[in-house]
């Protein structure tokens, strides 16, 4: 789907340079099909970089996707210009009376922070409760998965002793599941997290269906049977250099990080990394948009009655 964004959003020129199909609002108004309304709650510090990553994945389908960016942290950002936030982001009270076809909640660098110490924890809880009645399908990514499991299922925060960072192999558990349709039996995806997601914990304390696991037995992709919520514990949206940027940042901070697993050629940080997960990331988001959003969302969003199988 070509994504539909405001004409002036920096991602327009950035993604067009990569030959990604981006449709400005001006052009979209001449088409007579209803775009999917997708809300992105961007919790990452470098918001422009994160916008580019997610919009790239949302752009590769035959229908329009109307993107709305949401922020819930009113504190001054050290990584994103205030002008950008004011021009392209809305606050929750501006959209709380609307319905959306899809919601994406991004990760956040909060792996070692207790939930109640997160500055915007009450706002996250508010958005997730609101989404139950106002969003057809919600996709949680990395830290947002941990937050959602706590809010929706009461699962306590699970933290690893050491951060997991690198590109890991996964395998699908249900070859005919819609969200994994077209996946290879084994595929690669990046991880960068302290959060722990043992598959047994998900099976024992939720009614969610695990669709893909890491080779070590961590849940990677899981969802509710009614398709209303889906979870991905890694970062399929990452650019080729994102893990490298995080690694060198931590080196400069004196944190002595481990070299990201299976990422730099010959395990040498001086070598340029290659993205080995792009096809997986694109297919995952295309499947979510098609099977979890487009196929069940009502045509008239004023009446939130998803067509569930």
Swiss-Prot record:
Pathway-wise, it operates in:
Amino-acid biosynthesis; L-methionine biosynthesis via de novo pathway; O-succinyl-L-homoserine from L-homoserine: step 1/1
Q: What are the subcellular locations of this protein?
A: Cytoplasm
Record: residues binding substrate = 163, 192, 249
Please name the GO terms that the record assigns under molecular function: homoserine O-acetyltransferase activity; homoserine O-succinyltransferase activity
Q: Which reaction does it catalyse?
A: L-homoserine + succinyl-CoA = O-succinyl-L-homoserine + CoA
Q: Which Gene Ontology BP terms does the record give? A: L-methionine biosynthetic process from homoserine via O-succinyl-L-homoserine and cystathionine
> Site feature Important for acyl-CoA specificity: at which residues?
111
| One Pfam family per UniProt | HTS
Q: Which InterPro entries does the record cross-reference, listed alphabetically?
A: Class_I_gatase-like, HST_MetA, MetA_family
* Site feature Important for substrate specificity, where: 192
Entry's EC annotation: 2.3.1.46
The record's Gene Ontology cellular component field reads: cytoplasm
Keyword Nucleotide-binding assigned to the entry: answer is no
Q: Which UniProt keywords apply?
A: Acyltransferase, Amino-acid biosynthesis, Cytoplasm, Methionine biosynthesis, Transferase
Explain the purpose of this protein: Transfers a succinyl group from succinyl-CoA to L-homoserine, forming succinyl-L-homoserine.
Q: Which family does it belong to?
A: Belongs to the MetA family.
Q: Which HAMAP family match?
A: MetA_acyltransf
User: Which PANTHER family does the record associate with it?
Assistant: HOMOSERINE O-SUCCINYLTRANSFERASE (PTHR20919:SF0)
- Entry protein name: Homoserine O-succinyltransferase
Which species is this record about?
A: Klebsiella pneumoniae (strain 342)
Q: Which gene encodes it?
A: metAS
């Amino acid at each position: 789907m070509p994504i539909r964004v405001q004409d002036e959003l920096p991602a327009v020129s950035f993604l067009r340079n990569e030959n990604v199909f981006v449709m400005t609002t001006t052009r979209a108004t001449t088409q007579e099909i209803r775009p999917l309304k997708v809300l992105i709650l961007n919790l990452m510090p470098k918001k422009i970089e994160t916008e580019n990553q997610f919009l790239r994945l949302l752009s590769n389908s035959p229908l329009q996707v109307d993107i709305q960016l949401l922020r819930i942290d009113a504190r001054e950002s050290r990584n994103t210009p205030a002008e950008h936030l004011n021009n392209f982001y809305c606050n929750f009270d501006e959209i709380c009376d609307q319905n959306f076809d899809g919601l994406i909640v991004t990760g956040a660098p909060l792996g070692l922070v207790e939930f109640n110490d997160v500055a915007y924890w009450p706002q996250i809880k508010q958005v997730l409760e609101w989404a139950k009645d106002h969003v057809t399908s919600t996709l949680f990514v990395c830290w947002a998965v941990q937050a959602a499991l706590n809010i929706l299922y009461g699962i306590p925060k699970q933290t690893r002793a050491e951060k997991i960072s690198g590109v890991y192999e996964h395998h699908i558990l249900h070859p005919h599941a819609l969200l994994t349709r077209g996946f290879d039996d084994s595929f690669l995806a990046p991880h960068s997290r302290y959060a722990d997601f043992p598959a047994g914990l998900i099976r024992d304390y939720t009614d969610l269906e695990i669709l893909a696991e890491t080779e070590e037995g961590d849940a990677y992709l899981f969802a509710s049977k009614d398709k209303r919520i889906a979870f991905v514990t890694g970062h399929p949206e990452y650019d080729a250099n994102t893990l490298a940027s995080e690694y060198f940042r931590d080196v400069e901070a004196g944190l002595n990080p481990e070299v990201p697993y299976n990422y730099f050629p010959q395990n040498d940080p001086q070598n340029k990394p290659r993205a080995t997960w792009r096809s997986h990331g694109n297919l995952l988001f295309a499947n979510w948009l098609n099977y979890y959003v487009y196929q069940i969302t009502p045509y008239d969003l004023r009446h939130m009655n998803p067509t569930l199988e």
